[in-house]
């Protein structure tokens, strides 16, 4: 079993994700191996809120080049978490 803090890596703060907070949706960067039920349990455990829905997006790593050497940035996974009306996550409030 994975720990909740291993599944949720960090909150995603962007213009689009901040506009989603008005609709009670919060965006996180999560472990690429985590599934929706693990993400739901982790958010409920850490922030003490009720999650209604979890949508996930897999972001492919971009190709990077340093002189003649080609490489790739790692793939990431985003999760958009919809909360019950009335619930809030405080880390998104002051931004």
Curated annotation (Swiss-Prot):
Task: Name one process (GO BP) from the record.
Answer: translation
Query: Per its record, what are the GO molecular function terms?
Result: rRNA binding; structural constituent of ribosome
Keywords linked to the UniProt accession: Ribonucleoprotein, Ribosomal protein, RNA-binding, rRNA-binding
Cellular component terms (Gene Ontology): ribonucleoprotein complex; ribosome
Tell me which InterPro entries the record gives. Nucleotide-bd_a/b_plait_sf, Ribosomal_uL23-like, Ribosomal_uL23/eL15/eS24_sf
* Residue runs in coiled coils: none
Q: Which Pfam families match?
A: Ribosomal_L23
Tell me the SUPFAM superfamilies matching this sequence: Ribosomal proteins S24e, L23 and L15e
Q: Which HAMAP family match?
A: Ribosomal_uL23_B
Self-association state and partner proteins as the record states: Part of the 50S ribosomal subunit. Contacts protein L29, and trigger factor when it is bound to the ribosome.
Family, per the entry?
A: Belongs to the universal ribosomal protein uL23 family.
Function per UniProt: One of the early assembly proteins it binds 23S rRNA. One of the proteins that surrounds the polypeptide exit tunnel on the outside of the ribosome. Forms the main docking site for trigger factor binding to the ribosome.
| Protein name, as recorded | Large ribosomal subunit protein uL23
The protein's organism comes out as: Desulforudis audaxviator (strain MP104C)
């Amino acid at each position: 079993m994975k720990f909740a803090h291993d599944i949720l890596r960090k909150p995603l703060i962007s213009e689009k994700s901040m506009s989603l907070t008005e609709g009670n949706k919060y965006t996180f960067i999560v472990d690429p191996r985590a599934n929706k039920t693990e993400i739901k349990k982790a958010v409920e455990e850490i922030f003490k809120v009720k999650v209604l829905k979890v949508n996930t997006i897999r972001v492919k790593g971009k190709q990077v080049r340093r002189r003649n050497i080609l490489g790739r940035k790692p793939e990431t996974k985003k999760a958009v978490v919809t909360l019950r009306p009335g619930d809030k996550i405080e880390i998104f409030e002051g931004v």
